[in-house]
């Protein structure tokens, strides 16, 4: 287990029941990484090594409170579950982005995409100050270690097509559907 000045790094597997299992890594202060564990694939590349997706027991909403894990990990799991159940639009748990300057500019531009809306790769490139680097935006999105929180699922192709997503296009479509459904519900209530 890694140790640094912020404390021991912990990794848990959380089963959302909606988009499958997530591997969430953090310490006492912040979340550093969220990764999708996809079935039927038996493993996922995570932190430089291949880890089995089914070896560790997964926490769920029902047993998370009993878990002896960092409070920030519990908070992240709760907020992710609320988001997936259309009860939350933004995350408030602390995160740490780690990437190149360009990647971090792209991720910050993605953080500015409102819930329920999408932007094209070209629009994100412009927002990040590099209007011709729209292909590089796709590469930066692929290196996003905090999917869901940094909403790269809200970035689409120039013709409105769904393109690449670490969790798979089916998950990207599901996340966009969740957001559009909640947005429509809110509009109907107004």
Q: What are these language model-derived features?
A:
Residues 7-18, 82, 87-190:
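Nucleic acid-binding interface residues in structured DNA/RNA-binding domains
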């Amino acid at each position: 287990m890694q140790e640094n000045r912020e404390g021991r790094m912990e990794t848990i597997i959380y089963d959302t029941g909606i988009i499958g299992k997530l591997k969430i890594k953090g310490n006492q202060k912040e979340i550093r990484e969220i990764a999708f564990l996809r079935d039927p694939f038996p493993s996922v590349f995570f932190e430089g090594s291949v880890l089995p997706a089914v070896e560790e027991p997964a926490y769920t909403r029902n047993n998370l409170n009993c878990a002896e894990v960092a409070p920030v990990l519990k908070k992240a799991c709760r907020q992710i579950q609320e988001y997936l159940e259309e009860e939350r639009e933004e995350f408030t748990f602390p995160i740490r982005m780690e990437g190149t300057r360009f990647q971090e500019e792209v991720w910050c531009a993605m953080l500015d995409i409102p819930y329920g809306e999408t932007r094209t790769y070209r629009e994100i490139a412009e927002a990040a100050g590099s209007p011709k680097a729209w292909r590089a935006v796709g590469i930066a999105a692929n290196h996003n270690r905090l999917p869901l929180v940094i909403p790269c699922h809200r970035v689409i192709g120039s013709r409105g097509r769904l393109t690449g997503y670490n969790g798979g296009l089916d998950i990207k479509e599901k996340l966009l559907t969740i957001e559009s459904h909640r947005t429509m519900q809110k509009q109907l209530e107004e």
